[in-house]
Amino acid sequence: MTEDEQRPEGQEPGPASLPRRRVLVGLGLGAASFGLLRRLPTGRRPDRTGAAAPPTATTTTSTTAAPRPTVDVPPALDDSLAIADDGHVHDVVLAGGRVVDPGSHFDAVAHVGIDGDTITRISLEPLTGTTTVDARGLVVAPGFIDVLSYPVNGHGEWFKVADGVTTNLCLHGIDDTMADFLREASRLDPPVNYGGATDQYEHRKKMGVNLDWATEAQIQELAARATADVAAGALGIHEQPEYTLGLAFEELLAHGEVAARYDVPLCLHLRHSRPDPPSLQAEGVDEAIRVAWETGCRIHIEHLNSTGGTGRMADAVAQVDAARAEGLSITACVYPYTFWATYAGSARFDDFQDKYGIGHGDLQVANTPDRVTAAEWPSIRERNLLTAAFAMSEEDVTGALAAPWVMIGSDAILTESGNNHPRSTGCFSRLLGVYVRERGVLTLEDALARMTILPARLLEGVSSAMARRGRIQAGAVADVTVFDPDTIIDRSSIADTGVASAGVEHVLVGGRFVRRNGINDRSERPGLPILRDAE
């Protein structure tokens, strides 16, 4: 959904045909505990047999992961695809780099052999290759997986490559039917892998519902359209209650039931983002938990730092931890910035001073050098310009990174106009450069896990393509990012959003170099669709 739509005009608070409409929003739960939610009558309780175990770590003031024992035995995902012959000449060898595989905790100077699209050997001894890359002093990591991007557009994905991304997943929602999304992505022939979630609001627009309250019949039609997209390969279902102002709780439940049936995540931009009163954001998180509880679906909360956890991250993490302890499957992602951006005409900017406790001087239009003035603001809203709001704190980012179920998602892709948030070009390099190297908030392995193995595991149960990605292991797909840990950094700012990151030296997608020696190779287009497996 483009974020410039306004609230429905002249709407009553939902049609009378929805007797349970907006359950949580109207309950006044405030910061209600999950225990209270459990006592509410639901009529349906999911069978949570075999549900993910609750996290072993608890939220603390320190976000640095506890040290893990170093593993120096080369990992193998599939021994049948591994090559053990010492005389073998690999297609590509990445020689002498620090190989970090968060999925196995392997972290050692080693040599990676690649044949075709597959990693076939990891060795502590030198290997022979037709092409050998000197990776000494560099980190050899699984290719980064962006779980919260937007569809490839022929331009922005090359900035993703420079940021180390090999798989661009639009769990924020695709902008068409799944069939049309795949057709357009194939036409663009991208360098990165691609996939996405069906977007409930796009179907609302096609049906003419837009931001209005949907009738029961329309809700069923929306669920049927989501089902068709999932059957066509969509990896999840996306909804954004904050922007879809006529979205009733029944509609969330209907889509949650589809998500549960196909075991894909229901990806939510939560209903509330304003930090004052704190009870509103708590209700947004509670609503997501309630959907998981009633339907049994998996929930993925989008950009928790800007929606649900702003100014209250410790409490938001505690809410999710409590739900996970009950056996519910809930994850989240964040981007490592303290400002969000959306279009000035969006309802999110209605009464923004009261909502977020900020003023005009905390706003900045993308690709302009100065903060906004009160005199300029009416014109900016009328022109619907992309505007950043400096409305978060560092604790909103670092507090989320303390939770082991939080991964990284950019929530952006650069367009040719350059009109975007700098997270579109620098999200992953910023995490490694600022939050690992400069501030020591995360260990290198922990940071890499949040952009590789965690997103792979989120989706590998429904997409076998993801079961072989996010890993540096023999038998894994050779999606690999090689970067300099001493220089990797984001270079974009809100004043200049279209600057490529620095420090990513080599990127391979399916064993083919799309970036080598710090330069993108635009002749290489090996990206493949990442789809839900057919039944």
Named regions from a protein language model:
Residues 80, 135-140, 145, 149, ...:
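Divalent-metal coordination cores built from histidine and acidic residues
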Residues 19-25:
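N-terminal export leaders
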